[in-house]
From Swiss-Prot:
Component of the RNA polymerase III complex consisting of 17 subunits: a ten-subunit horseshoe-shaped catalytic core composed of POLR3A/RPC1, POLR3B/RPC2, POLR1C/RPAC1, POLR1D/RPAC2, POLR3K/RPC10, POLR2E/RPABC1, POLR2F/RPABC2, POLR2H/RPABC3, POLR2K/RPABC4 and POLR2L/RPABC5; a mobile stalk composed of two subunits POLR3H/RPC8 and CRCP/RPC9, protruding from the core and functioning primarily in transcription initiation; and additional subunits homologous to general transcription factors of the RNA polymerase II machinery, POLR3C/RPC3-POLR3F/RPC6-POLR3G/RPC7 heterotrimer required for transcription initiation and POLR3D/RPC4-POLR3E/RPC5 heterodimer involved in both transcription initiation and termination. The keyword Cell membrane applies. DNA-dependent RNA polymerase catalyzes the transcription of DNA into RNA using the four ribonucleoside triphosphates as substrates. Specific peripheric component of RNA polymerase III (Pol III) which synthesizes small non-coding RNAs including 5S rRNA, snRNAs, tRNAs and miRNAs from at least 500 distinct genomic loci. With POLR3H/RPC8 forms a mobile stalk that protrudes from Pol III core and functions primarily in transcription initiation. Pol III plays a key role in sensing and limiting infection by intracellular bacteria and DNA viruses. SMART domains: RPOL4c. InterPro entries: HRDC-like_sf, RNA_pol_Rpb4/RPC9_core, Rpb4/RPC9, Rpb4/RPC9_sf, RPC9. One of its GO terms (molecular function) is calcitonin gene-related peptide receptor activity. SUPFAM superfamilies: HRDC-like (SSF47819). One of its GO terms (cellular component) is dendrite. It is found in: Nucleus; Cell membrane. This is DNA-directed RNA polymerase III subunit RPC9. Gene3D superfamilies: 1.20.1250.40. Keywords: Antiviral defense, Cell membrane, DNA-directed RNA polymerase, Immunity, Innate immunity, Membrane, Nucleus, Transcription. It comes from the Eukaryota.
């Protein structure tokens, strides 16, 4: 395999998730032979990638959400790579944003970081792990409230 243009496009985790899910469905429908070594390697990589990505916030995203997020990000002066990191990781704290935005101390004020955090958390849906941790903490809080 030869890389013609390494910087042709940046893909979000959501786009990779959709691409691999569609590829998996096409293979199921066509009933392709899975006996070749190359095909087995591709199946293993596809499986592991889908397994990982399905635990991230991108699993709950849609094209409309991605478009809304990118439109909202226009007011923030961020690079494409920084926007992509925010989209892929859905930071929930100011520290996470500071780690994703290069030279954030010089480029962003605390108010801008808070506005960015609000934009990210209000537009992008929570990931499966975030939802599980919320339900676990809610269950623990309910157990504490119940008289023993």
């Amino acid at each position: 395999m030869e890389v013609k243009d390494a910087n042709a496009a940046l893909l979000s985790n959501y786009e990779v998730f959709q691409l691999l899910t569609d590829l998996k469905e096409q293979r199921k429908e066509s009933g392709k032979n899975k006996h070749s070594a190359g095909q087995q390697n591709l199946n293993a990589i596809t499986y592991e990638t889908l397994k990982y990505i399905s635990k991230t916030p991108c699993k709950n995203q849609s094209p409309a959400i991605v478009q809304e997020f990118l439109t909202a990000m226009k007011s923030h002066k961020l690079t494409k790579a920084e926007k992509l990191q925010l989209l892929n990781h859905r930071p929930m704290t100011a520290v996470e944003i500071q780690l994703m935005v290069e030279e954030s101390e010089e480029r962003l004020t605390e108010e801008q970081i808070e506005a960015l955090l609000h934009t990210v958390t209000s537009i992008l849906p929570a990931g499966p792990e975030d939802e599980q941790s919320k339900s676990t903490s809610n269950d623990a809080a309910m157990e504490e409230e119940e008289p023993a």
